[in-house]
From Swiss-Prot:
This is Crossover junction endodeoxyribonuclease RuvC. Pfam families: RuvC. HAMAP family: RuvC. CDD domains: RuvC. Its EC number is 3.1.21.10. The lineage of its organism: Bacteria, Pseudomonadati, Pseudomonadota, Alphaproteobacteria, Hyphomicrobiales. Mg(2+) 2 binds at residue 72. NCBIfam families: ruvC. Mg(2+) 1 binds at residues 12, 144. Homodimer which binds Holliday junction (HJ) DNA. The HJ becomes 2-fold symmetrical on binding to RuvC with unstacked arms; it has a different conformation from HJ DNA in complex with RuvA. In the full resolvosome a probable DNA-RuvA(4)-RuvB(12)-RuvC(2) complex forms which resolves the HJ. It comes from Nitrobacter hamburgensis (strain DSM 10229 / NCIMB 13809 / X14). The active site is at 12, 72, 144. GO terms for molecular function: crossover junction DNA endonuclease activity; DNA binding; magnesium ion binding. PANTHER family: CROSSOVER JUNCTION ENDODEOXYRIBONUCLEASE RUVC. It is an enzyme of class 3 (hydrolase).
Length: 170
């Protein structure tokens, strides 16, 4: 009996640009499906930007129909206002798959880097180099889309443990 592929959506939340990446996993095989980003303009009102992120991710969810989703956890920086705005974008990005009945797993940035590159303090160029090896058909047009694919890869590797954590916590 062969198992059918499981489709995963990775999300890299951001107010300016929210990256998304979709891949299928079958056993230990990763297959690139698509990636991109939802962009907003700084001149837009905050509520309009959040709505644009929600609608953009809704279109991605409609088109690709993932079974699982993952998002990067927010890091707190020195700029409290920027951190709050990122948190709002992250909340909207988590809501979109939840409205489709999809549980959203969360991963720390250093866990994503360690999973994809092997080092928790890897930089963006190292992540992009590994993406070319792991997903040769992927051609992300932005760092945010590349990060979203890295988040999806992380979930593919840790999904069993993530499901168990959610079950225990729930």
């Amino acid at each position: 009996m062969t198992s059918s592929p499981i489709r995963i959506l990775g999300i890299d939340p951001g107010l300016r640009r929210t990256g998304w990446g979709v891949l299928d996993i079958e056993g230990n095989r990763l297959m690139f499906v698509g990636c991109g980003s939802v962009e907003t303009r700084e001149q837009m009102a905050l509520a309009s930007r959040l709505l644009a992120i929600h609608e953009g991710l809704g279109r991605v969810l409609d088109e690709f129909r993932p079974a699982e989703a993952a998002i990067e956890q927010t890091f707190v920086n020195k700029d409290g206002v920027a951190t709050l705005k990122l948190g709002q974008a992250r909340g909207v990005a988590m809501l979109a798959p939840a409205m489709f009945g999809i549980v959203v797993a969360e991963y720390a940035p250093n866990q994503v880097k360690k999973t994809v590159v092997g080092a928790g303090h890897a930089d963006k160029t190292q992540i992009q180099a590994m993406l070319k090896i792991l997903l040769p058909k992927a051609d992300p047009k932005s760092a945010d889309a590349a990060d979203a694919l890295a988040i999806a890869i992380t979930h593919a590797h840790h999904r069993g443990a993530a499901a168990l954590r959610m079950k225990v916590a729930g």
